[in-house]
Amino acid sequence: MAMDSKKEIRLKRELGYFWGTNFLIINIIGAGIFVSPKGVLQHSSMNVGVSLCVWAVCAVLTLTSALCSAEIGITFPYSGAHYYFLKRCFGPLVAFLRLWTSLFLGPGLIASQALLLAEYGVQPFYPSCSAPILPRKCLALAMLWIVGILNSRGVKELSWLQTVSSVLKVGILGVISLSGLFLLVRGKKENVQRLQNAFDAEFPEVSQLIEAIFQGYFAFSGGGCFTCIAGELKKPSKTIPRCIFTGLPLVTVVYLLANISYLTVLTPQEMLSSDAVALTWTDRVIPQFTWTVPFAISASLFINLVINVLETSRVLYIASENGQLPLLFCALNVHSSPFIAVLLIISMASILIVLTNLIDLINYLYFVVSIWTALSIIGILKLRYQEPNLHRPYKVFLPFTFIALGITLSLVLIPLVKSPKLHYIYVFLFLLSGLVFYVPLIHFKVKFVWFQKLTCYLQLLFNICIPDVSDDHIHEES
């Protein structure tokens, strides 16, 4: 555990610019760019020029949201800052409902990713049919507990894995991009004409264009990840903006060049009909390296699994520090990792893997994530008005805040209007069910004596310790 001259025990601030930039890149670049970057093209009416413009617009929209999150993470530099920020702006009830969502959405997402990773690992052994469910579940559970062990070793131990994953993703996309540019310069006439006449196809309607922007915006999701680990970054007021202005332009260039490369080799119709665009591209251009694409997809899923466990555990950590979860969940092991929080997440995800039918229901909670994001942006405006003298080392440009709020509210309202489903009612009922626990445990502060004994026993069993209050928290409370 981290101990300074005053023997304080807390999460270490030991992550710098290079780690933060890698963290942002691997959060944004997922398996989607290898498998199905065709949603934007499809909703752009297969207009190549419009689809590339949409990718660029989505990058700008993502930048506005990322900078809003940066203000939160820099003003309140704690791990799990988005939870703390909601509590600061809207009170303990809203923060608890945010926590209540994370307790189920986090493990649900992790279980889904583990099963998908297992499917890519098992399927090659069953070339003529679908892989049986039992081997997939066993492999998913094995990978999940490996991820749990890695997370329990602390953030610093994940650096090498994160660097390898980042180099792998950007490297393979770089090969695709550079090969595409080479083919564009020295390629066939029809390939060159496809991009020269990029805007000749029919222009999409406004509704289609909006849908294309949503598709692209989802591909850039993850730009607000620094609020989860702000408490472990060195000099967050400098590190976070630098990482955003380095990582996001790099991802944008890679996305644009990869799409140009795909469109140089494949027609729009071929892209839409392909189940894995990068695999089709590689099979046509460099057939000897077709195996690299499934490998890159598996690596992307694995590192995203690691990062999602890390981010969810930090929400439980700060909720425990703020008294909305037992102190046990912020207890740190010798590697400065919230071990019990990680253990709970892995255990819940394991149960969901066994009971696969529950994962689809939990994934509907994604809808609620946009609500929390919108509330966070509203909170920025609220604090600007109520606490104008609050120390803010970084302030996002106000028009960016309104742009980010507009796109986030659209993500909430358009699904409700366009395709209302009964599941959304279930989501709201689930959200309200958090009150059953909030009222007795948080509002009336009901305590269980046996849990205090359990806390002492588990501290001895796992060699974990409750952290001290950091200087940041002392300053904030004063």
From Swiss-Prot:
The keyword Electron transport does not apply. Associates with SLC3A1/rBAT to form a functional heterodimeric complex that transports anionic and neutral amino acids across the apical plasma membrane of renal epithelium. Preferentially mediates exchange transport, but can also operate via facilitated diffusion. May act as a major transporter for L-cystine in late proximal tubules, ensuring its reabsorption from the luminal fluid in exchange for cytosolic L-glutamate or L-aspartate. It is found in: Apical cell membrane. It catalyses: L-cystine(out) + L-aspartate(in) = L-cystine(in) + L-aspartate(out); L-cystine(out) = L-cystine(in); L-aspartate(in) + L-glutamate(out) = L-aspartate(out) + L-glutamate(in); L-aspartate(in) + L-glutamine(out) = L-aspartate(out) + L-glutamine(in). The chain crosses the membrane at residues 15-35, 48-68, 90-110, 130-150, 164-184, 209-229, 243-263, 289-309, 339-359, 361-381, 396-416, 424-444. Expressed in renal tubules in the outer stripe of the outer medulla and medullary ray (at protein level). Detected in male but not in female kidney. Disulfide-linked heterodimer composed of the catalytic light subunit SLC7A13 and the heavy subunit SLC3A1. Keywords: Amino-acid transport, Antiport, Cell membrane, Disulfide bond, Membrane, Transmembrane, Transmembrane helix, Transport. InterPro entries: AA/rel_permease1, AminoAcid_Transporter. GO terms for cellular component: apical plasma membrane. GO terms for biological process: aspartate transmembrane transport; L-cystine transport; L-glutamate transmembrane transport. Residues 36-47, 111-129, 185-208, 264-288, 360, 417-423 are extracellular. It is a multi-pass membrane protein. The lineage of its organism: Eukaryota, Metazoa, Chordata, Craniata, Vertebrata. This is Solute carrier family 7 member 13. It comes from Mus musculus (Mouse). GO terms for molecular function: antiporter activity; protein heterodimerization activity. Residues 1-14, 69-89, 151-163, 230-242, 310-338, 382-395, 445-478 are cytoplasmic. Belongs to the amino acid-polyamine-organocation (APC) superfamily.
